[in-house]
């Protein structure tokens, strides 16, 4: 190794380190430093990194950009603060307000329409048709906006993309039977009477039908009430459960796998059936030839099925297919098969219904509107063609946003305020049903309150959150997280509540079971659970006990004392220790220190 050259060029790295970290008395000030300068930001900074080209922006961003260009400033006004008490019926309407809103709904129900496709002929060009559709769609949106603004009526968020309505128009035009799939727990909310009128406007011979999905959640008596109601409305109805059919198909598939050695016998049976079908087909051909010789009878009216009255029976998959095959006897759009259009809200089970009928997954299932971009045609059988329309949220009247959350129209994971929805749930589901379902004890009303009132959202969520272990960082039950679980149980049918038809009182239509568990008093619960259930609440008895209780004053001593015959009690006071004649050093750890948070844990109780 050569000798180190001391007179060579200086080391660049060492010079940089000295310049950066050197502790010299005098430091050279370069001309390009920021010393004694001020950044005024009085010009446009073209060299900033967040400069980006804007070619497309949302309506809100466009509004803010226009206001910024106009020199408009926005300031938050922190006046008129409203205190929301979670121990009241927050976000719900009173009985008088509900009656007034129902009257408004009945008065303006005829104005609740869906957009119509403008009339067109073969001479109409594509540009003229698109222009007419856009104008009609804008007029429809303007009418609904004026209805909401003038009458202060709350409506469900409806589809605002014209392309989705174009898909509905095409489905209606090519369908012989238009089936509206509704939720059995609230069929009238998901039924669009104006869609039925539009179907008849397109072609009077077309037929409307309602398929009540999730009907396994209803009893036979409840289905009978709805069948009678739709009979009075003059519309055919069928009751079906896609989830029940899917479970049966899975069970049958498992049974087939279990009986795998019998596959050969099944194949022989299939061959025998094929041979018998061939002989039956030959006989049918002979009968058909004889039938053609009989003169046809003319009848202007459409023939009706022998069983025109709606049946409350829950149909199976094969029964529903046979029902769809025989329900329509008018002129068909395509002579070879009957076309059945499937229309429905998202989250009512439209895709699940189609998949259960096809016995394989043909349509993607999603609770989000817009999953299906274009209508699809699927052959259910050689003479039945299903036409699946994209999921459409049609305009409908509701009382509050809590209604939309409980009916699955608004996503629960995106809700901002859980209190109104949980309050509405507590009004619909009795206290003892909630306690039996979740195995919890909900706090009883305080003195002076109505003992029969439904629980508030805070009372239910505190008990549920503590029971499930959903706690916040400060040791209190997490109410927002508990609310999402409880609301999803309601939407999924685990907490069952079904709305009655207008002709039947709600109290007679839906009844709840009696209490299944024994009544547990709050005094039997652990102290920590009692305090968690009574956050910011105290009874007069608790106030009296706290005010008149003995509160001895004493000094808090930390660590060991220098008096061998004196020891610390649990409350921090000094008491007599062991016998003076005994050996004080026995069974005593000299350096023992008790944690203060354990000694004074009663001060941290919430």
Swiss-Prot record:
GTPase required for the nuclear export of the 60S ribosomal subunit. Probably acts by mediating the release of Nmd3 from the 60S ribosomal subunit after export into the cytoplasm. Regulator of body size; acts in serotonergic neurons to regulate insulin signaling and thus exerts global growth control. It comes from Drosophila melanogaster. GO terms for molecular function: GTP binding; GTPase activity. Belongs to the TRAFAC class YlqF/YawG GTPase family. LSG1 subfamily. Residues 584-600 have a biased composition (Basic residues). Residues 1-21, 574-606 are annotated as: Disordered. It comes from the Eukaryota. GO terms for biological process: nuclear export; protein transport; regulation of insulin receptor signaling pathway; ribosomal subunit export from nucleus. The modification Phosphoserine is found at residues 276, 279. Transmembrane segments: none annotated. This is Large subunit GTPase 1 homolog. One of its GO terms (cellular component) is Cajal body. SUPFAM superfamilies: P-loop containing nucleoside triphosphate hydrolases (SSF52540). Disruption phenotype: Larvae reach less than 60% of normal size and have fewer and smaller cells, the adults that survive exhibit normal body proportions and are healthy. In the brains excess serotonin and insulin accumulate, while peripheral insulin pathway activation is low. InterPro entries: G_CP_dom, GNL1-like, GTP-bd, GTP-bd_ortho_bundle_sf, P-loop_NTPase. GTP binds at residues 213-216, 344-351, 388-391. Keywords: Cytoplasm, Developmental protein, Growth regulation, GTP-binding, Hydrolase, Nucleotide-binding, Phosphoprotein, Protein transport, Transport. The lineage of its organism: Eukaryota, Metazoa, Ecdysozoa, Arthropoda, Hexapoda. Expressed in larval serotonergic neurons.
């Amino acid at each position: 190794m050569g000798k180190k050259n001391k007179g060579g060029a200086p080391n660049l790295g060492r010079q940089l380190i000295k310049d950066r970290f050197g502790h010299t008395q005098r430091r050279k000030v370069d001309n390009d430093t920021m010393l004694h300068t001020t950044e005024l930001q009085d010009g446009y900074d073209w060299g900033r990194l967040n400069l980006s080209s804007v070619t497309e922006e949302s309506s809100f961003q466009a509004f803010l950009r226009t206001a910024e260009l106009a020199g408009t400033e926005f300031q938050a006004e922190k006046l008129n603060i409203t205190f929301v008490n979670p121990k009241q019926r927050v976000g719900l309407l009173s009985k008088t307000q509900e009656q007034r809103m129902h009257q408004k709904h009945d008065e303006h129900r005829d104005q609740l329409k869906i957009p119509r496709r403008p009339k067109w002929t073969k001479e109409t060009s594509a540009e003229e048709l698109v222009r007419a559709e856009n104008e009609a769609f804008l007029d429809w949106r303007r009418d609904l906006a004026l209805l909401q603004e003038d009458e202060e009526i709350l409506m469900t968020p409806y589809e605002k993309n014209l392309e989705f309505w174009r898909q509905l128009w095409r489905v209606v035009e090519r369908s012989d039977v238009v089936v509206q799939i509704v939720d059995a727990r609230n069929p009238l909310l998901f039924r669009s009477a104006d869609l039925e009128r539009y179907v008849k406007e397109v072609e009077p011979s077309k037929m409307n039908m309602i398929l009540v999905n999730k009907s396994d959640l209803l009893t036979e008596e409840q289905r009978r009430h709805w069948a009678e109601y739709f009979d009075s409305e003059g519309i055919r109805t069928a009751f079906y459960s896609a989830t029940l059919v899917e479970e049966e198909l899975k069970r049958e598939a498992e049974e087939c796998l279990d009986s795998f050695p019998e596959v050969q016998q099944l194949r022989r049976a299939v061959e025998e059936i094929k041979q018998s079908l061939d002989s039956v087909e030959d006989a049918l051909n002979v009968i058909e030839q004889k039938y053609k010789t009989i003169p046809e009878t003319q009848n202007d009216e459409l023939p009706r099925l022998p069983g025109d009255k709606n049946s409350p029976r829950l149909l199976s998959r094969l029964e529903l297919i046979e029902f769809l095959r025989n329900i329509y006897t008018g002129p068909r759009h395509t002579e070879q098969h009957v076309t059945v259009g499937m229309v429905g809200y998202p989250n009512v089970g439209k895709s699940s219904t189609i998949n259960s009928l096809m016995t394989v997954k043909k349509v993607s299932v999603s609770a989000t509107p817009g999953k299906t971009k274009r209508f699809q045609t699927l052959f259910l059988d050689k003479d039945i063609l299903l036409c699946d329309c994209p999921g459409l949220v049609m305009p409908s009247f509701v009382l509050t946003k809590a209604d939309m959350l409980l009916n699955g129209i608004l996503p629960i994971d995106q809700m901002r305020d859980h209190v109104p929805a949980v309050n509405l749930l507590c009004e619909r589901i009795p206290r003892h049903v909630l306690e039996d379902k979740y195995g919890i004890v909900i706090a009883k009303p305080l003195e002076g309150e109505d003992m029969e009132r439904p629980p508030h959202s805070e009372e239910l969520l505190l008990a549920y959150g503590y029971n499930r272990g959903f706690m916040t960082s400060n040791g209190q039950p997490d109410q927002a997280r508990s609310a999402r679980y409880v609301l999803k149980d309601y939407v999924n049918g685990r907490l069952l509540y079904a709305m009655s038809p207008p002709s039947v009182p709600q109290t007679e239509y839906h009844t709840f079971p009696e209490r299944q568990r024994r009544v547990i008093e709050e005094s039997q619960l652990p102290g920590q659970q009692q305090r968690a259930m009574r956050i910011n609440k105290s009874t007069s008895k608790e106030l009296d006990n706290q005010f008149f209780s003995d509160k001895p004053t004493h000094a808090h001593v930390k660590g060991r004392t220098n008096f061998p015959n004196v020891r610390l009690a649990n409350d921090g006071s000094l008491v007599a220790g062991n016998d003076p004649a005994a050996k004080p050093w026995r069974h005593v750890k000299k350096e023992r220190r008790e944690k203060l948070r354990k000694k004074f844990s009663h001060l941290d109780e919430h």
